[in-house]
């Protein structure tokens, strides 16, 4: 299962579709965002994905976590959203 990485420039609907697809296929999705703009896009995508999945009769929960990520030899703090069926 791949991590869905979100940037501030990510299309919300594309990320929402990826989340919904991962839930349907793997019953779990992990979304990672670094920075306020990226976290904003990730949360909006999560809200859209809930609607997509609800129409399929799938109810999900989202568990936010802080994670440290190494980028170009620097450690950055990211938000990871773990999405699972309820």
Would you name each region that the model predicts?
Residues 2-28, 42, 46, 50, ...:
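Conserved mixed alpha/beta catalytic, RNA-binding, or beta-rich assembly cores of soluble enzyme
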Residues 1-2, 86:
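Low-complexity, interaction-prone regions
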